[in-house]
Design a protein with these regions (language model features):
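Conserved small-residue
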Residues: 1-21, 120
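Flexible loop and strand-edge segments within Gram-negative outer membrane beta-barrel domains
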Residues: 23-63, 67-70, 81-157, 167-174, ...
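Flexible, surface-exposed loop regions and adjacent strand-edge segments
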Residues: 76-81, 121-133, 211-221, 227, ...
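Extended hydrophobic secondary-structure segments that form protein cores and membrane-embedded regions
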Residues: 194-202, 270-276
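Alpha-solenoid helical-repeat scaffolds
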Residues: 229-240, 252
Length: 277
């Protein structure tokens, strides 16, 4: 058994892990409970308005969705590094009877999204969530007796430090759509004839801002004389700042259509000629 080698843990070690009598040298940390709340909150608001008269009709919708993160944030960075998500939306449609023959439909839509997450080791919450399940409960204490971050040679990125003291990453999205549809009825000249002109502009942008940093950790032990010994691992790096435009998309679209629709007795005829760009 054990190839004749001495046991890695003694009976005294197991007792200390179990009764938490020496939490700094024999930690037993439930990382899920230490880092994450059991629940979170989501907010959603929407306001709609409609109205008009025989000349114009409108519809407007304004909405907001907000989600708070599951990470605990007992203090750390001045900027809240918890996972959050905010979305603002607005859409409007207006139908206008310019003349008896000419009508216009205008559509405007906009959306702004922003998500924040802790920096972790540079890749955000993915680093933290994967580390929660791969870090043993006895790997290191959350903090040492002197308040420094706990760690070891094998685990040189403290999980709580990654959550509240690693800076933050912000992902942003901006979407705008504008469209107009004009229709002229030539029925007074040629029954059933009309012309449509459609134009739209779409703009989408995705960006990421990273303001991340790392902290050193210390492996705490007690030497044979009873003195505290702190061995440093990892590297303390000041906050870096970077901005990247992940994607930018713009599209302009135009269409011209000539429509003809007539009813001849029991027969209905409909034809369209389209051109777009």
């Amino acid at each position: 058994l054990n190839d004749g080698k001495n046991p890695f843990y003694s009976y005294d070690d197991f007792i200390k892990f179990r009764d938490h009598s020496s939490p700094y040298t024999h930690p037993s940390v439930n990382w899920c409970d230490e880092l994450m709340n059991k629940n979170s909150t989501t907010q959603s608001y929407n306001l709609n308005a409609t109205g008009g008269n025989k000349y114009a009709q409108y519809f407007i919708s304004v909405g907001y969705v907000g989600e708070n993160g599951l990470f605990k944030n007992p203090g750390g960075d001045a900027h809240d590094t918890n996972m959050t998500f905010d979305r603002y939306m607005i859409s409007s449609k207006v139908n206008i009877n310019i003349t008896d023959d000419l009508t216009a439909k205008v559509t405007l839509m906009g959306r702004i999204e922003e998500g924040t997450q802790p920096g972790g080791t540079g890749n955000g919450y993915d680093d933290i969530l994967s580390s929660i399940y791969s870090t043993p409960s006895n790997a290191y204490p959350v903090t040492n007796p002197d308040g420094s971050w706990g760690g070891s040679q094998s685990f040189n990125n403290n999980l709580l430090s990654q959550t509240i003291n690693s800076g933050y990453i912000t992902d942003g999205a901006r979407d705008v759509l504008g469209a107009i549809n004009l229709r002229y009825d030539f029925g007074k000249l040629v029954k059933g004839l009309s012309v449509r002109m459609v134009g739209s502009v779409t703009s989408q942008n995705r960006s990421t801002t990273k303001q991340t940093k790392t902290s050193e950790v210390f492996d705490y032990t007690i030497d044979k004389d009873g003195n505290d010994v702190y061995t440093r691992y990892g590297e303390k790096k000041t906050q870096s700042n970077s901005f990247s435009s992940v994607s930018t998309y713009r599209q302009m679209y135009g269409q011209l259509a000539v429509d003809y629709e007539r009813q001849f007795g029991k027969h209905k005829f409909k034809a369209s000629v389209l051109g777009d760009t």
